[in-house]
Protein backbone atom coordinates (compact mmCIF):
# COMPACT_ATOMS: atom_id res chain seq x y z
CA UNK A 1 0.00 0.00 0.00
CA UNK A 2 1.48 3.37 -0.93
CA UNK A 3 2.09 5.83 1.90
CA UNK A 4 -0.59 8.31 0.75
CA UNK A 5 -3.30 5.65 0.71
CA UNK A 6 -2.10 4.22 4.02
CA UNK A 7 -2.32 7.69 5.61
CA UNK A 8 -5.88 8.13 4.25
CA UNK A 9 -6.97 4.75 5.62
CA UNK A 10 -5.44 5.45 9.04
CA UNK A 11 -7.06 8.90 9.18
CA UNK A 12 -10.37 7.34 8.18
CA UNK A 13 -10.15 4.75 10.99
CA UNK A 14 -9.34 7.42 13.61
CA UNK A 15 -12.14 9.64 12.35
CA UNK A 16 -14.67 6.78 12.43
CA UNK A 17 -13.75 5.93 16.02
CA UNK A 18 -13.91 9.54 17.21
CA UNK A 19 -17.06 10.37 15.25
CA UNK A 20 -19.07 7.32 16.35
CA UNK A 21 -18.18 7.90 20.02
CA UNK A 22 -19.48 11.46 19.73
CA UNK A 23 -22.50 10.43 17.66
CA UNK A 24 -23.80 7.68 19.98
CA UNK A 25 -23.09 9.78 23.10
CA UNK A 26 -25.19 12.53 21.50
CA UNK A 27 -28.02 10.19 20.49
CA UNK A 28 -28.13 8.58 23.94
CA UNK A 29 -27.40 11.55 26.23
CA UNK A 30 -27.57 14.87 24.37
CA UNK A 31 -30.18 14.35 21.72
CA UNK A 32 -31.09 18.04 21.63
CA UNK A 33 -27.62 18.65 20.12
CA UNK A 34 -27.73 15.93 17.44
CA UNK A 35 -28.41 18.39 14.62
CA UNK A 36 -24.93 19.85 14.86
CA UNK A 37 -23.57 16.55 13.51
CA UNK A 38 -25.56 16.78 10.25
CA UNK A 39 -25.19 18.95 7.16
CA UNK A 40 -28.08 21.31 6.46
CA UNK A 41 -29.16 19.10 3.52
CA UNK A 42 -28.37 15.71 5.09
CA UNK A 43 -30.63 12.68 4.62
CA UNK A 44 -31.71 10.20 7.28
CA UNK A 45 -33.34 6.82 6.80
CA UNK A 46 -34.20 5.40 10.23
CA UNK A 47 -35.63 1.91 10.07
CA UNK A 48 -37.71 2.81 7.02
CA UNK A 49 -38.64 6.35 8.09
CA UNK A 50 -37.02 9.25 6.29
CA UNK A 51 -36.08 12.84 7.03
CA UNK A 52 -34.30 15.36 4.84
CA UNK A 53 -32.50 18.38 6.23
CA UNK A 54 -31.06 19.14 9.63
CA UNK A 55 -34.29 20.54 11.10
CA UNK A 56 -36.40 17.52 10.12
CA UNK A 57 -33.67 15.19 11.41
CA UNK A 58 -33.53 17.04 14.75
CA UNK A 59 -37.33 16.78 15.05
CA UNK A 60 -37.24 13.08 14.23
CA UNK A 61 -34.68 12.35 16.95
CA UNK A 62 -36.71 14.29 19.54
CA UNK A 63 -39.61 11.89 18.95
CA UNK A 64 -37.56 8.74 19.61
CA UNK A 65 -37.64 7.10 23.05
CA UNK A 66 -34.50 7.34 25.17
CA UNK A 67 -31.78 4.92 24.09
CA UNK A 68 -28.55 3.23 25.07
CA UNK A 69 -26.30 2.05 22.22
CA UNK A 70 -23.42 -0.42 22.58
CA UNK A 71 -21.15 -0.49 19.55
CA UNK A 72 -19.75 -3.93 18.65
CA UNK A 73 -18.22 -3.47 15.19
CA UNK A 74 -16.92 -0.52 13.27
CA UNK A 75 -15.53 -0.30 9.74
CA UNK A 76 -14.65 2.72 7.65
CA UNK A 77 -13.39 3.39 4.15
CA UNK A 78 -12.28 6.58 2.44
CA UNK A 79 -14.51 7.48 -0.50
CA UNK A 80 -12.65 8.17 -3.72
CA UNK A 81 -12.35 11.85 -4.53
CA UNK A 82 -14.24 11.62 -7.81
CA UNK A 83 -17.34 10.20 -6.09
CA UNK A 84 -17.81 13.23 -3.83
CA UNK A 85 -16.70 16.22 -5.92
CA UNK A 86 -13.12 16.05 -4.66
CA UNK A 87 -14.30 16.54 -1.08
CA UNK A 88 -12.87 14.48 1.77
CA UNK A 89 -15.53 11.92 2.72
CA UNK A 90 -15.67 8.60 4.56
CA UNK A 91 -18.09 5.69 4.61
CA UNK A 92 -18.59 4.49 8.21
CA UNK A 93 -20.40 1.25 9.03
CA UNK A 94 -21.30 0.49 12.64
CA UNK A 95 -23.28 -2.25 14.34
CA UNK A 96 -24.15 -3.25 17.85
CA UNK A 97 -27.00 -3.42 20.34
CA UNK A 98 -29.51 -0.80 21.37
CA UNK A 99 -32.00 -0.62 24.21
CA UNK A 100 -34.83 1.85 23.75
CA UNK A 101 -36.96 2.74 26.79
CA UNK A 102 -39.51 0.03 27.62
CA UNK A 103 -38.25 -2.21 24.79
CA UNK A 104 -36.03 -5.26 24.64
CA UNK A 105 -32.38 -5.11 23.61
CA UNK A 106 -32.08 -5.29 19.81
CA UNK A 107 -29.33 -5.40 17.24
CA UNK A 108 -28.79 -2.50 14.86
CA UNK A 109 -26.58 -1.52 11.98
CA UNK A 110 -25.89 1.97 10.74
CA UNK A 111 -24.11 3.37 7.71
CA UNK A 112 -22.94 6.97 7.50
CA UNK A 113 -21.33 9.04 4.82
CA UNK A 114 -19.50 11.89 6.54
CA UNK A 115 -17.59 14.83 5.12
CA UNK A 116 -15.49 17.61 6.59
CA UNK A 117 -17.13 21.03 6.89
CA UNK A 118 -15.11 23.80 8.55
CA UNK A 119 -12.86 21.27 10.30
CA UNK A 120 -15.86 19.36 11.72
CA UNK A 121 -17.19 16.01 10.50
CA UNK A 122 -20.80 16.19 9.37
CA UNK A 123 -23.22 13.50 8.26
CA UNK A 124 -24.21 13.66 4.60
CA UNK A 125 -26.27 10.46 4.65
CA UNK A 126 -27.36 8.22 7.54
CA UNK A 127 -29.10 4.85 7.26
CA UNK A 128 -30.07 3.09 10.53
CA UNK A 129 -31.69 -0.36 10.58
CA UNK A 130 -32.93 -2.49 13.45
CA UNK A 131 -32.19 -6.17 12.97
CA UNK A 132 -35.10 -8.56 13.21
CA UNK A 133 -34.31 -11.77 15.08
UniProtKB/Swiss-Prot annotation:
Subunit structure: Forms a complex with RanGAP, Nup358/RanBP2 and sbr/Nxf1. In the ovaries, part of a complex composed of at least Panx, nxf2, piwi and Nxt1. The complex is knowns as Panx-induced cotranscriptional silencing (PICTS) complex, Panx-nxf2-dependent TAP/p15 silencing (Pandas complex), SFiNX (silencing factor interacting nuclear export variant) or piwi-Panx-nxf2-p15 (PPNP) complex. Interacts with nxf2 (via NTF2 domain); the interaction is direct and prevents Nxt1 binding to nucleoporins. Interacts with sbr/nxf1. Interacts with Nup54 and Nup58.
Disulfides per UniProt: none
Gene3D superfamilies per the UniProt record, alphabetical: 3.10.450.50
InterPro entries recorded: NTF2, NTF2-like_dom_sf, NTF2_dom, Nuclear_transport_factor_2_euk
Functional description taken from the UniProt entry: Stimulator of protein export for NES-containing proteins. Plays a role in the nuclear export of mRNA. Also plays a role in the nuclear export of U1 snRNA, tRNA, and mRNA. In ovaries, plays a role in transposable element silencing regulation. Forms a complex with nxf2, Panx and piwi which acts as effector of cotranscriptional transposon silencing. In ovarian follicle cells, enables the nuclear export of flamenco (flam) transcripts and subsequent piRNA biogenesis.
Top-rank taxon, per record: Eukaryota
This protein's UniProt keywords: mRNA transport, Nucleus, Protein transport, Transport
Cellular component terms per the entry's GO annotation: cytoplasm; nuclear envelope; nuclear pore central transport channel; nucleoplasm; nucleus; transcription repressor complex
Primary location: nucleus
Descriptive protein name: NTF2-related export protein
One Pfam family in the UniProt entry: NTF2
The keyword Protein transport is assigned to this record: yes
Gene Ontology BP, a term: protein transport
Species, as recorded: Drosophila melanogaster
Tissue: Expressed in female gonads (at protein level).
Localization in the cell: Nucleus; Nucleus envelope
Gene null: resulting phenotype: RNAi-mediated knockdown in the germline increases transposon expression.
SUPFAM superfamilies: NTF2-like (SSF54427)
Domain NTF2 per the UniProt entry, residue ranges: 15-130
